[in-house]
Amino acid sequence: MVVAHKTLPNRRDSVRALWEKRLAPTVLDNPGHLAYYYGLDSDDPDGITAFQHYRSAEDALEFLRHPAYLAYEREVAPLLAAAPEVRRLVPTWIKKET
């Protein structure tokens, strides 16, 4: 899953701080997340993109119901310029570490 956020002007640091407070610990403790990348857009000072690789579709749905995620969603909404753009992907090839 790829989630692209567009923050209100000059609010990206606030969104990042909220993500680090609410979601980073939850992601670290979530066995359903096989990988999670949180990235700041180099070309857009208000852009954030998260790449999430879940073990299963059920794990993704479970995470979206987690109390920390629901709290984050409520708190971050006023800081965003628009609703996040969500793309669901089916991994078809993954580079494995050797």
Model-derived segments and spans:
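An amphipathic, aromatic/His-enriched active-site/gating alpha helix that lines ligand/cofactor pockets
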Residues: 21-34, 53-87
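Short, surface-exposed ligand-recognition loops at beta-strand->loop->(often short) alpha-helix junctions
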Residues: 6-16
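Short, low-order "capping/linker" segments at domain edges
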Residues: 89-98
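Short, well-ordered beta-strand segments in beta-rich or mixed alpha/beta enzyme
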Residues: 1-6, 35-64
